[in-house]
């Protein structure tokens, strides 16, 4: 089963009744505006099931933004097929302008987690096994954490 491809109008922050700094939004507020699976992955640091994300096989031209707050994360030009089960990107927008990297030693592994710098949503992980002809990095991102805006 493939999950929905979220669009700009699905961004959670835009559904709140008041304007707020995304870091000041309470978990109960996020839970009230985000679908259950998005909340579980983005706000509770979960992982969507591999090969089920709506953007795994999605290669239209445009940009990907954080589904919680709308911050720009990736351009479609950086997307590539990695076969890992999640959307893969070789670089983020503005050299991690809207992304924070955090050492993740959970589940007996040593990885680098990536989170949204604006709202602290868990996005996925970045690995050093990406295309050598670009950055050598592979951002492995949960589809449910992103919305897509098509480029005309």
UniProtKB/Swiss-Prot annotation:
Q: What does this protein do?
A: Methionine-sulfoxide reductase that specifically reduces methionine (R)-sulfoxide back to methionine. While in many cases, methionine oxidation is the result of random oxidation following oxidative stress, methionine oxidation is also a post-translational modification that takes place on specific residue.
Q: What is this protein called?
A: Probable methionine-R-sulfoxide reductase B
Q: Coiled coil located at which positions?
A: none
Task: Give a yes or no for keyword Zinc in this entry.
Answer: yes
The protein's required cofactor(s) are namely: Zn(2+)
| Signal peptide residue numbers | none
Query: What positions does the entry give for Zn(2+) binding?
Result: 66, 69, 116, 119
Q: Which SUPFAM superfamilies match?
A: Mss4-like
Q: Kindly report, in one word, the top-level EC class recorded for this enzyme.
A: oxidoreductase
Enumerate the Gene3D superfamilies for this protein: Peptide methionine sulfoxide reductase
GO molecular function list = metal ion binding; peptide-methionine (R)-S-oxide reductase activity
Taken from the UniProt entry, a GO cellular component term is: cytoplasm
| Gene source species | Caenorhabditis elegans
Q: Which residues form the MsrB domain?
A: 27-151
In its keyword annotation, does this UniProt entry include Oxidoreductase? yes
What are the EC numbers?
1.8.4.12
Annotated keywords: Metal-binding, Oxidoreductase, Zinc
């Amino acid at each position: 089963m493939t999950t929905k491809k979220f669009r700009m109008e699905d961004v959670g922050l835009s559904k709140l009744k008041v304007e707020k700094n995304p870091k000041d939004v309470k978990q109960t507020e996020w839970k009230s505006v985000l679908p259950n699976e998005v909340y579980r992955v983005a706000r509770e640091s979960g992982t969507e099931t591999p090969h089920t994300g709506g953007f795994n096989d999605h290669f239209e031209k445009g940009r990907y933004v954080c589904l919680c707050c709308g911050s720009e994360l990736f351009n479609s030009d950086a997307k590539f097929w990695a076969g890992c089960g999640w959307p893969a990107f070789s670089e983020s927008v503005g050299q991690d302008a809207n992304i924070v990297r955090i050492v993740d030693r959970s589940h007996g592994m040593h990885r680098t987690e990536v989170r949204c710098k604006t709202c602290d949503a868990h996005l996925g992980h970045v690995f050093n096994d990406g295309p050598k002809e670009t950055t050598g990095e592979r951002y492995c991102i949960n589809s449910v954490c992103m919305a897509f805006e098509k480029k005309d």
